């Protein structure tokens, strides 16, 4: 691909990702920030496509956009939040948070200015070799991850279940 | 060809924006969304390291990170739902039960 076109697309994704993530934390209605987060996750999937990681793009779209965002939107609909208009949106010391974040960003920029990119890049990544690596060398973390997912599912059901308010020993 | 530092700058920018949002908002659900933004920034850094080192380990760590982020979203939303259902509180400044 022509490198100029590639860089133009990269700059577009940089600007749109920044604007979308600012819109997530600055929008007044909470369902609007959920939908801004949806477009943000789709742009991150496009960034994965830039990095020759097609499998990660599919996983990002299926898990995040199909699972986590649906969970967020269902939770917002269940809670029926109207208290946003009673309160102020930001905390009192939000200036301190902004200064902390900008100092962190400035430190990272100074640190990242000297990064050199190596020559040998990943030419193409097939799902076959990724699965072989996952099922041979990273097999134990994969199994532990399945247990973590199971425990999170059971714990989420138990925490969110509607419990009877007064029990018998009252 | 895009150099490596561009992707790292994108990751740093998104992580800082998520950090700022986590500090200055008081909605519990928006704080969880800012956690998702920070997870995605770190995933971009992992995938770019995987690309520029021609090594697939970074992509496997992105898989693990996505699964842990899904667990975190499930548990966090369940806790927020239990709080709203039992006390009617949605803001992090009003949770003062443990203050004594």
Swiss-Prot record, chain B:
Signal peptide: none
Main location per the UniProt record: membrane
Compartment list: Cell inner membrane
BP term (GO), one: ATP synthesis coupled electron transport
EC number of this enzyme: 7.1.1.-
Segments traversing the membrane: 4-24, 29-49, 60-80
Catalytic reactions on record: a quinone + NADH + 5 H(+)(in) = a quinol + NAD(+) + 4 H(+)(out)
Membrane topology of the entry: Multi-pass membrane protein
Pfam families: Oxidored_q2
Function: NDH-1 shuttles electrons from NADH, via FMN and iron-sulfur (Fe-S) centers, to quinones in the respiratory chain. The immediate electron acceptor for the enzyme in this species is believed to be ubiquinone. Couples the redox reaction to proton translocation (for every two electrons transferred, four hydrogen ions are translocated across the cytoplasmic membrane), and thus conserves the redox energy in a proton gradient.
HAMAP family, per database record: NDH1_NuoK
Complexes and interactors: NDH-1 is composed of 14 different subunits. Subunits NuoA, H, J, K, L, M, N constitute the membrane sector of the complex.
NCBIfam families for this protein: PRK05715.1-2 (NF004320)
Protein name: NADH-quinone oxidoreductase subunit K
Gene that produces this protein: nuoK
